[in-house]
């Protein structure tokens, strides 16, 4: 499934109009329409906003979406997607941090859970800020 199809599917499943979603996501109706028609691609920030409008995680929004013929199935590690979805901790994690954290791996191992991801985020933020 392509991203624009997934976006339209999410809206249709919920019985929402373009106007409803655009208002909650604070984007224009024409822009949302272009996204759903595949005429333009959203930024990570827009994906986070749309995921919030649908009350799902970005991971869930992208689940099964294909990019360049490859599926995003399991694109973000579960613990990281749990951290992003956390209503208290998630808003602290900017799109840049999501990209940075999603690349962390050493000898095939990644942090195990939400708490591990959060500790790594805090340490890196302290060191790099």
Curated annotation (Swiss-Prot):
Residues 7-61 form the HTH cro/C1-type domain. Signal peptide: none annotated. InterPro entries: Bact_TransReg_Diox, Cro/C1-type_HTH, Lambda_DNA-bd_dom_sf. It comes from the Bacteria. Residues 18-37 bind DNA. GO terms for cellular component: cytosol. The keyword ATP-binding does not apply. GO terms for molecular function: DNA binding; DNA-binding transcription factor activity. Keywords: DNA-binding, Repressor, Stress response, Transcription, Transcription regulation. Cleaved between Leu-106 and Arg-107 by the IrrE metalloprotease after exposure to radiation. Cleavage inactivates DdrOC, leading to derepression of the target genes. Forms at least dimers. Interacts with IrrE. Repressor specific for genes preceded by a radiation/desiccation response motif (RDRM) site, which is present upstream of several radiation-induced genes. This is HTH-type transcriptional regulator DdrOC. The lineage of its organism: Bacteria, Thermotogati, Deinococcota, Deinococci, Deinococcales.
